[in-house]
C-alpha cells in the first residue's frame, strides 16, 4: 500500500461542510478529543514564550506577529473543528512561517534556525499520516513536537542579529527596489 498524505482530516459524514454551514446550526465534528486538544493547546502556547523573548530583544514587529499566532492557535485549539477558525489559524501560521523564513535570511543564526525549522516542518505530514489512520495520540505527539521545535527555532533566530526586512533581497525584488 503506497504512502498517501491527506491535507485535511476525513469527514465523519458523507456531506462536506461548506460556507452554507456557517449560517446553520450544523457544526463540523471535533477533530480531536478534549484531552488531545488541551494537550495541543498547551504546546501551542510555547509561542508566547518566544514572542516575549522576541519583544525583549526589541524585534517588536516579529513579536506582534507571533502574538497574533498565539491568539489564532488558542481560538482553534479550544474547540478544534474543521471550520473557519482552523482555516484562519493555518493561513496565519503559513504567513508567519514565510515571514520568519524571509527574516532569517542573512541573520546571525540562520543555519540553526533553518535546520531546526526543516526538522519541525517534517513532522507535519507524519502527523497527518497517523491522524488519517486513526492513531490520534501519535498524531497529537508529532504535531506537538512541531509546535515545540518550531518555537525553539524561533528562539534561536531571535537570539542573534536579524537584519531589517527591507535589506532582504527577496523583499527588495518583490517591491521593486
Say what each PLM segment does:
Residues 2-177:
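Multi-pass alpha-helical transmembrane bundles in non-GPCR membrane proteins
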Amino acid at each position: 500500500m503506497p504512502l498517501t498524505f491527506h491535507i485535511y482530516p476525513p469527514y465523519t459524514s458523507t456531506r462536506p461542510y461548506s460556507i452554507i454551514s456557517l449560517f446553520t446550526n450544523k457544526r463540523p465534528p471535533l477533530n480531536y478529543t478534549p484531552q488531545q486538544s488541551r494537550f495541543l493547546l498547551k504546546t501551542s502556547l510555547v509561542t508566547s514564550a518566544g514572542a516575549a523573548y522576541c519583544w525583549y530583544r526589541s524585534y517588536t514587529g516579529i513579536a506582534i506577529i507571533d502574538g497574533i499566532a498565539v491568539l489564532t492557535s488558542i481560538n482553534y485549539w479550544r474547540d478544534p473543528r474543521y471550520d473557519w477558525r482552523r482555516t484562519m489559524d493555518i493561513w496565519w501560521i503559513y504567513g508567519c512561517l514565510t515571514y520568519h523564513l524571509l527574516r532569517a535570511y542573512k541573520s546571525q543564526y540562520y543555519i540553526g534556525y533553518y535546520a531546526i525549522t526543516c526538522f519541525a516542518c517534517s513532522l507535519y505530514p507524519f502527523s497527518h499520516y497517523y491522524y488519517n489512520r486513526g492513531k490520534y495520540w501519535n498524531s497529537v505527539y508529532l504535531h506537538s513536537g512541531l509546535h515545540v521545535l518550531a518555537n525553539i527555532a524561533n528562539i534561536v533566530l531571535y537570539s542573534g542579529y536579524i537584519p531589517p526586512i527591507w535589506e532582504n533581497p527577496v523583499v527588495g525584488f518583490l517591491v521593486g527596489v
